[in-house]
Amino acid sequence: MKKLLSALALAAVVAPVWAATQTVTLSVPGMTCSACPITVKKAISKVDGVSKVDVTFETREAVVTFDDAKTSVQKLTKATEDAGYPSSVKN
């Protein structure tokens, strides 16, 4: 029983370490004017777990930093698509 409690306590402490902050660059080719990045940034910023968003019209890219324990790339691309700007991960 003591070992079980120790294992559970260790898991509770270590679990947050497994979550990682990731940065991904999304290609957003549908941005056609200088106001589009504002809409894209607002849409991505509303996704739970996103900590930073930089959207550039000239390159038609969004660089997003997020907590992968709270969200995923799929949720980010869905957010841009729902805002009218389909996106994909830039390779």
Curated annotation (Swiss-Prot):
InterPro entries xrefs: Heavy-metal-associated_CS, HMA_dom, HMA_dom_sf, MerP, MerP/CopZ
Keyword annotations of the record: Mercuric resistance, Mercury, Metal-binding, Periplasm, Plasmid, Signal
GO MF annotation list: mercury ion binding; mercury ion transmembrane transporter activity
PROSITE patterns according to UniProt: HMA_1, HMA_2
Places the protein is found: Periplasm
Subunit composition and interactions: Monomer.
Protein name: Mercuric transport protein periplasmic component
Protein source organism: Pseudomonas fluorescens
Organism lineage string: Bacteria, Pseudomonadati, Pseudomonadota, Gammaproteobacteria, Pseudomonadales
Gene symbol of the encoding locus: merP
